[in-house]
């Protein structure tokens, strides 16, 4: 099966439809997305390779997915730590933080010190809707993820990448190439620039909605929330 990519406009419209005619709440979608990310991390980095996972969390929904993933990783036996410098005030994110705090998952202020003592990084800073300039404190964080030898898993899009054009031509993120990408719902056009292990996650789309947005839902096996795909399985 050749999986079609979703543009930023189509992906945003799909999210709105899932929360209207699809009858999902944003909490449900974030929970299922974060669960997918946690399964991908467990697949590529089993605990025997190191339990410490640093989750870099941004201020939007991508960051929410990261908080959910951190919680699930804790329950799998990992030792997550969360870097969350820009916290929204709304109730959804505050509840996600509380859930992690109740598990005594540490929130760290110094990303760079935490990076020196972790086994894996989850990049949940910016997602498919990112555009414009990377603002503080994230430029140095993205550059550090680009330079580290620690494996990095990005959520839906490598942070700073344009959804269509991939990595910036220069500046922040121009040399950021994570090891793993988890595309949520469907791949985005930027995957043509990505060379690592690629998963699709988000096992919640009804066939009628997939047909309307002209993309294929991959075949998930058993109880898996992710499917690993190869370059020749994506239609740009």
Curated annotation (Swiss-Prot):
Binds 1 potassium ion per subunit. It is found in: Cytoplasm; Mitochondrion. Keywords: Cytoplasm, Isomerase, Metal-binding, Mitochondrion, NAD, NADP, Nucleotide-binding, Potassium. (6S)-NADPHX binds at residues 61-65, 127-133, 156. Its cofactor is K(+). GO terms for molecular function: metal ion binding; NAD(P)HX epimerase activity; nucleotide binding. Its EC number is 5.1.99.6. It catalyses: (6R)-NADHX = (6S)-NADHX; (6R)-NADPHX = (6S)-NADPHX. One of its GO terms (cellular component) is mitochondrion. Residues 11-217 form the YjeF N-terminal domain. K(+) binds at residues 62, 123, 159. It holds the Pfam family YjeF_N. Its main location: cytoplasm. Belongs to the NnrE/AIBP family. Catalyzes the epimerization of the S- and R-forms of NAD(P)HX, a damaged form of NAD(P)H that is a result of enzymatic or heat-dependent hydration. This is a prerequisite for the S-specific NAD(P)H-hydrate dehydratase to allow the repair of both epimers of NAD(P)HX. PANTHER family: NAD(P)H-HYDRATE EPIMERASE. This is NAD(P)H-hydrate epimerase. It comes from Neurospora crassa (strain ATCC 24698 / 74-OR23-1A / CBS 708.71 / DSM 1257 / FGSC 987).
């Amino acid at each position: 099966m050749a999986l079609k990519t979703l543009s930023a406009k189509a992906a945003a419209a799909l999210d709105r439809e899932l929360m209207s005619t699809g009858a999902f709440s944003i909490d449900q979608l974030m929970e299922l997305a974060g669960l997918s990310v946690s399964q991908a991390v467990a697949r590529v980095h089993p605990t025997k390779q190191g339990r410490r996972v640093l989750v870099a969390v941004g201020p939007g929904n991508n960051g929410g997915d990261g908080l959910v993933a951190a919680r699930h990783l804790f329950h799998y036996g990992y030792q997550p730590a969360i870097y969350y410098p820009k916290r929204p005030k709304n109730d959804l994110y505050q509840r996600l933080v509380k859930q992690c705090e109740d598990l005594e998952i540490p929130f760290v202020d110094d990303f760079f010190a935490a990076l020196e003592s972790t086994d894996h990084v989850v990049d949940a800073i910016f997602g498919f809707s990112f555009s414009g300039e990377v603002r503080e404190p994230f430029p140095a964080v993205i550059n550090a993820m680009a330079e580290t030898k620690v494996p990095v898993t990005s959520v839906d899009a490598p942070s700073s990448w344009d959804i269509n054009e991939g990595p910036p031509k220069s500046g922040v993120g121009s040399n950021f190439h994570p090891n793993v990408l988890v595309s949520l719902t469907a791949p985005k056009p930027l995957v043509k620039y990505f060379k690592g292990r690629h998963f699709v996650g988000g096992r919640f789309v009804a066939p009628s909605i997939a047909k309307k947005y002209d993309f294929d839902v991959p075949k998930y096996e058993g109880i898996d929330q992710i499917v690993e795909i190869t370059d020749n399985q994506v239609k740009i």
